[in-house]
Amino acid sequence: MDTGKIVQIIGPVIDVKFEISFIPKINFALEIKIKNKKLIMEVMQQIGDGIVRCILMGSSDGLKRGLKVFNLNKGIEVPVGKPTLGRIMNVLGDPIDRKGKILSSEYRPIHNKSPSYNEISSSDELLETGIKIIDLICPFAKGGKIGLFGGAGVGKTVNMMELIRNIAIEHSGYSVFSGVGERTREGNDFYNEMISSNVIDKVSLVYGQMNEPPGNRLRVALTGLTLAEKFRDEGNDVLFFVDNIYRYTLAGTEVSALLGRIPSAVGYQPTLSEEMGILQERITSTKSGSITSVQAIYVPADDLTDPSPATTFVHLDATVVLSRQIASLGIYPAIDPLDSTSRQLDPLIVGEDHYLVARKIQSILQRYKDLKDIIAILGIDELSEEDKILVSRARKIQRFLSQPFFVAEIFTGFSGKYVTLKDTIDGFNSIINGEYDYIPEQAFYMTGNISDVLDKYKKFYS
């Protein structure tokens, strides 16, 4: 018989006893029917004697020992394809936007193997984001993996929202957003922002917010990835956004503790690298289409050496590091140009001009950072004339790296700006060469391209 009964309940961990010949496989979905609703759980361990240990995908309220459990003989499957666009679903693929059932003809299991070595395709093509500091210092590759690293409140979600808006409007591609263990309010704001930007019909949303059980939060990234894989397999270039990878790790830690595994460093699960690898290896481009992944990664206590962000680093092509120090100066996006890196910043990929301008910008900002202590102790007048000019240009560069976002217009009061890569390179090159040494640094703050700076200068300073 493909039915068992509950023998133990410990929070979201349920032990179910089956006849030994009918024991379900790992990752199979089991169903409990209770009070006109269905609860789904996933098999995590086979602990012997016909007993399997499962993790619930919902609340355990109302469960009791002896309840009948049905083996579905397959893993969790979710609807995929174009009917999911503009819709919000949960980890099980059920709609949570009160717009009725998602009418998809195809369902896919959330547990899939990553593409074989022969199917994988790589590309050096750049993905223009319209955000100056990203396009210049840490350019994104089409089909690459990008991490947005930052502590609490430095702008990871806002940067992600701007990226979705820019790429959906300027490149008209499909996006999939997985909200993993984040605030419900943020999910609501995000949904409304997508509607107001008129890009909601190009985005599929999968939410498993922080009040959900750990099993739900652990699997919601896989649900989103399954949707993205379908779009990729149809020949599309897809953007896959995950907010937040740290919560995915945290859910794994909770599940690991509930299953009785001995924790490793700093309390993380011993299977941290494996779980991260299973997710990240599926986020890849094939000969039919590409998945470009942007992942927000919370950094506990701003410590980049913490095992969770450190494990994620190895999978990424570009790292965008958000700095609390830069945010405190009022410069947004608060991206650190000295810490952020990209494998694409290579003269053979981006071109000689782009590469030289980016490296020159970094060297000027690094020199300014080194001089800050001298300026603080002795004052700027004690510097050589050459260093005084360098400091002046560095401060202009710092302010020119700020940019008004479309999704943050309500907060900044500035109209959003999309800046092309050519305008970005030309603008920074002209500052390096001293063409605008006569313009005060305030004119460079919260502007788009260099013509915006000149307009601001004429309006306020001439």
From Swiss-Prot:
Q: Name one Pfam family in it.
A: ATP-synt_VA_C
- Record key words, sorted: ATP synthesis, ATP-binding, Cell membrane, CF(1), Hydrogen ion transport, Ion transport, Membrane, Nucleotide-binding, Translocase, Transport
Q: Which InterPro entries match?
A: ATP-synt_VA_C (IPR055190), ATP_synth_F1_bsu (IPR005722), ATPase_a/bsu_AS (IPR020003), ATPase_alpha/beta_chains (IPR050053), ATPase_F1/V1/A1_a/bsu_N (IPR004100), ATPase_F1/V1/A1_a/bsu_N_sf (IPR036121), ATPase_F1/V1/A1_a/bsu_nucl-bd (IPR000194), ATPase_F1/V1_b/a_C (IPR024034)
User: Which Enzyme Commission numbers does its entry carry?
Assistant: 7.1.2.2
According to UniProt, the reaction catalysed is: ATP + H2O + 4 H(+)(in) = ADP + phosphate + 5 H(+)(out)
Q: Which GO terms describe its molecular function?
A: ATP binding; proton-transporting ATP synthase activity, rotational mechanism
Q: Could you give one GO CC term from the UniProt record?
A: plasma membrane
Q: Where in the cell is it found?
A: Cell membrane
Function statement: Produces ATP from ADP in the presence of a proton gradient across the membrane. The catalytic sites are hosted primarily by the beta subunits.
* Entries under PANTHER family matching the protein: ATP SYNTHASE, ATP SYNTHASE SUBUNIT BETA, MITOCHONDRIAL
The identity of this protein, by name, is ATP synthase subunit beta
Look up and give the organism this protein is from: Wigglesworthia glossinidia brevipalpis
